[in-house]
Regions:
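Solvent-exposed loop/turn and edge beta-strand elements of beta-rich ligand-binding domains
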Residues: 1-275
Length: 275
């Protein structure tokens, strides 16, 4: 006779009254996988917790390329699956809950966690995704023909493209890191814009408080101004002891730059003509 069940075990009874009964207690076991929501491939680098109804963490681990096995959970009790750290390039997923039936299998009727065909619980993460649009600053229309780069904190170009009439989508950027948006080639008739920066929050959205790039409806905007035509007179003088010298055998060239480092030229190179 068994008067009570051991917590975290499944009890099975075999035999008969004539020969006797055998009660076998088997510890409960459930597998949990951390996967990409798109292709269901295992993801390493997440920190996962299993939390009981009283808020106690009964199991936690860092995900690897294989499913994690949790044993000794109580049938009939509701547990919470929580991700506290997402893999790089992914967003934190929301909490889900699950319950085991008396036979140790997952109760699909009381479980919000995704369950695979083999009964494994899936903690699904989405890749970070951000849209970048190249637009005219005056009317917000998309501009094609610009070359845009996204640069990480170490100066590495993690994505680059030539703008089209549609926004560009960049995936798997790290949350909480500062990225630089840089335009290296402007569309014909437009001026190069200055660098801006942006940061993604843990849920994958743009962190407005830490972002200098203009953002509209979650889309980062690289805004260009139309180049305007103007002329400027440049005079080159050579003097010696207060006297102007003629230097007809020398040619000097001038150009205008938009930055003090003189890396962003905004005019043609012109030769000075002596008059």
């Amino acid at each position: 006779e068994e008067t009570g069940k051991a917590a975290g075990y499944i009890s099975t009874v075999t035999g008969n009254a004539e020969e006797g009964f055998i009660i076998t207690n088997t510890i409960t076991s459930v597998k949990i996988s951390k996967v990409d929501i798109t292709d269901q491939k295992e993801l390493a680098g997440a920190h996962i917790q299993v939390i009981d109804k009283d808020g106690n963490v009964v199991e936690e681990w860092d995900s690897t390329w294989e499913a994690h096995e949790v044993t000794g959970l109580k049938p009939g009790e509701t547990y919470t699956l929580r991700e506290t750290v997402a893999p790089e390039g992914y967003t934190l997923t929301s909490d889900t809950t699950f319950t085991l039936k008396e036979d140790g299998t997952v109760n699909k009727d009381t479980t919000t966690t995704t369950i695979s065909d083999n009964g494994t619980l899936l903690v699904e993460d989405s890749r970070t995704s951000v849209k970048v649009s190249k637009v005219d600053i005056s009317d917000g229309k998309e501009l094609e023909g610009a070359h845009i780069q996204i640069i990480d904190q170490d100066g590495n170009v993690v994505d680059e493209w030539d703008s089209t009439k549609e926004a560009h989508i960049t995936e798997k950027l790290k949350t909480g890191k500062i990225y630089t948006l840089r335009e290296t080639v402007a569309p014909d008739g437009y001026l190069l814009t200055s660098d801006t920066t942006f940061v993604l929050k843990e849920d994958g959205t743009v962190d407005a408080e830490k972002t200098t790039a203009v953002s509209k409806d979650g889309v980062l905007l690289v805004q260009d101004k139309l180049a305007t035509t103007a002329s400027i007179a440049v005079t080159k003088k050579l003097t010696y002891i207060g006297e102007n010298l003629a230097a007809r055998d020398q040619t000097f060239y001038v150009a205008l730059y938009s930055d003090k480092e003189c890396t962003q030229r905004v005019s043609d190179v012109k030769a000075l003509v002596f008059k």
